[in-house]
């Protein structure tokens, strides 16, 4: 508790930007996954607005790279019909239309900007607020919105969506790394961004070109192993052998350690990653909650302790249950990526043992959302319902 009091006192005396940036490194890293997709339509300015209102430390998001070289905030390799709707072609007779179902790498920014990605509530997230007509944003547009919405030095955990198994479905790691460097340099935001990727080659290239940029090695038990002969990634109990397509040519079984947890951490350390971001639950698990029989955690205390001994932090994804939150606290993780940042924030406040980032100014944030959020011509009322 004393550390929280000291941190609050210091921030109350001085609010200069460098100090705020230091403070954000001291907060428990509460990350809103895709902004907080359990609460608001994912990877959109509305989701990031509510992430700020809920007091996240870090806005987590994903990037696609369009055919004409624009970074779009979006998770999927293609335009998912459960999340977006077509509103019309850019020009009459466009052979790529309809755009829904097409891959981001094959679409231009103009084509992507016709999509309504704010009207559809996902079945798996029935409490999502929708903002009808919302367009996808570029990385630059997202930074501009956040700059308007808060003076806090909120952090960004940004994934480059590179497909390690099927390289023709996305732009290359080289293309992504070049593109993010141009935008991060333009905004001089290096010390607030973590570059995360399942495709570790992107992280290797990132460290070579931008050594000041933090990198996070994403993985689950389908990406740390070589594909099975049937093309699937497998899991902890059934998988291929040899170098994984996702780990920049590394074979985790060649690294020292009695357990998979130790070996994968050492593999991440070998590419100079600053942190690891494993799936909370293993693909081999037959249950979704630690309280249930058959639950298998991919992240465990051995993994956390090994990472910390090598100077790496551990921030797992995607924890959406209170029992998972408690499990992760118990094994000593440094942050949690969740679809429900409001619920995690409530639990952290109740525990009272972790310093937390400030909650956002609702009026200011919503004013900036009204200014920056772009809508298709078929937009609804824009109020979130």
Locate the predicted segments by residue:
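Phosphate-group recognition and catalysis centered on beta-loop-alpha active-site segments
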Residues: 2-5, 12-385
């Amino acid at each position: 508790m004393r550390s929280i009091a000291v941190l609050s006192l210091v921030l109350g005396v001085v609010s200069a930007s460098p100090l705020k940036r230091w403070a954000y490194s001291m907060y428990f890293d509460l990350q809103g996954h895709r902004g907080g997709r359990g609460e608001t339509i994912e990877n959109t300015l509305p989701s990031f607005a509510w992430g700020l209102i809920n007091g996240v430390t870090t806005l987590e998001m994903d990037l696609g790279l369009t055919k004409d070289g624009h970074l779009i905030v979006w998770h999927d390799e293609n335009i998912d019909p459960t999340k977006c709707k077509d509103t019309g072609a850019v020009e009459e007779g466009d052979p790529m239309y309809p755009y829904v179902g097409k891959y981001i790498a094959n679409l231009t920014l103009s084509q992507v900007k016709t999509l309504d990605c704010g009207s559809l509530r996902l079945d798996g997230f029935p409490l999502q607020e929708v903002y009808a007509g919302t367009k996808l944003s570029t990385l630059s547009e997202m930074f501009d919105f956040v700059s308007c919405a808060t003076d806090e030095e909120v952090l960004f955990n940004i994934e480059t969506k590179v497909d390690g198994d099927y390289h023709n479905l996305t732009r290359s790691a080289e293309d992504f790394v070049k593109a993010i460097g141009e935008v991060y340099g333009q905004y001089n935001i290096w010390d607030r961004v973590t570059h995360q990727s399942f495709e570790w080659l992107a992280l290797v290239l990132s460290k070579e070109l931008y050594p000041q940029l933090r990198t996070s090695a994403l993985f689950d038990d389908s990406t740390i192993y070589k594909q099975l002969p049937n093309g699937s990634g497998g899991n902890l109990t059934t998988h291929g052998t040899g170098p994984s397509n996702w780990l920049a040519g590394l074979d985790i079984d060649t690294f020292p350690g009695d357990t998979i947890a130790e070996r994968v951490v050492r593999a991440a350390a070998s590419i100079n990653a600053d942190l690891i971001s494993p799936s909370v639950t293993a693909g081999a698990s037959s249950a979704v909650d630690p309280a249930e029989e058959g639950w298998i955690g991919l992240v465990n205390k051995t993994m956390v302790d090994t990472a910390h001994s090598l100077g790496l932090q551990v921030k797992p994804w995607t924890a959406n249950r209170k029992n998972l939150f408690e499990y992760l606290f118990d094994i000593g993780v440094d942050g949690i990526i969740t679809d429900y940042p409001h619920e995690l924030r409530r639990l952290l406040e109740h525990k009272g043992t972790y310093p937390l980032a400030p909650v956002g100014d609702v009026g200011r944030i919503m004013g900036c959302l009204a200014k920056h959020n772009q809508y298709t011509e078929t937009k609804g009322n824009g109020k979130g319902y």
